[in-house]
């Protein structure tokens, strides 16, 4: 006999039924269907053949491998099967309550093949063809190093002729962060660097292994210093940004394997760290070989970084006195003597002279060509 609607007996029965459902769910949970079984079930329902799955899975051979459980479902396949056959995402993902992640923006805009060749996906051991089939999964895992952190891109310093590829820059930055995370550093103390530290770093340029000593000095101060080859179409010499933990770091590409470029780029990025990085979550990407563009001339951050780097490398009063005393014709001996008086590498003074005169044919032998990369393990 049914309980009367709205009666106490009906409420007790409803509560009893709910308790039974909860008990059964807890003690006898219903497992999700197997994703391949679910595909076969939908094929049977819809009267589909294997060839009908090509548009979801990619090719006849891939369909066969998936249905024979010899190939895992990729996110791309799962999305198409979910939309096309209506199979719940949690079934295809084999995850109770699982939801498909939003597709990675610009998935096909990253230099994926170059990233693979350079070992950016060190956690993956398959061939390039296999990597391309799970591109989204690999890129999602690779960019997880950012931990959801977003950066305010400062105006990239680059020539008008060279437009930096934003996707390649993002990939390069993620790789630099990954390499930095592989090392251990002491805590970074905010404001611990001073201009005296900068001057000490410049003094290290007098030594053949000065770049290595500079990296060691910065890392002892809790600042990662990464050397990472630039990706195509980035035109990148150096960068400065924070890790997700808030630790500032420097990364150089050694695109121009010269001592003068190394020391100027390093001091330029350190100037950004010292002057600008605490203000916001900035990332600075710099091409330091080209003159400032018209827009950069009006960017105070680039002008300030240039000014501090130049001042620390060679004090303005010392430079002006030397230039007025030496006259128009400057010999290699003059450059060596001036550098020796300052306790710095002659490459720095030779590079400054070439920059100011615009005569890049002179003093090439004094710039420390191919003297930097050989000191570092290339990444």
Name what the model sees in each region.
Residues 51-52, 80, 337:
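Alpha-helical residues within helix-turn-helix
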Residues 11, 24, 30-35, 41, ...:
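Active-site hotspot residues in diverse enzymes, especially metal/ion-binding acidic/histidine motifs
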Residues 28-35, 48-60:
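Short, flexible active-site-proximal loops enriched in glycine and acidic residues
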Residues 76-91:
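DNA major-groove recognition helix of helix-turn-helix/homeodomain DNA-binding modules
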Residues 1-38, 45:
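N-terminal flexible/basic segments that precede or flank functional cores
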Residues 57-73:
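Recognition helix of helix-turn-helix/homeodomain-like DNA-binding domains
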Residues 43-44, 72:
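Short amphipathic helical patch at the helix-1/turn junction of helix-turn-helix
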Residues 48, 58, 73-76, 333:
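Residue-level signal for the short linker/turn that defines the boundary of a DNA-recognition helix
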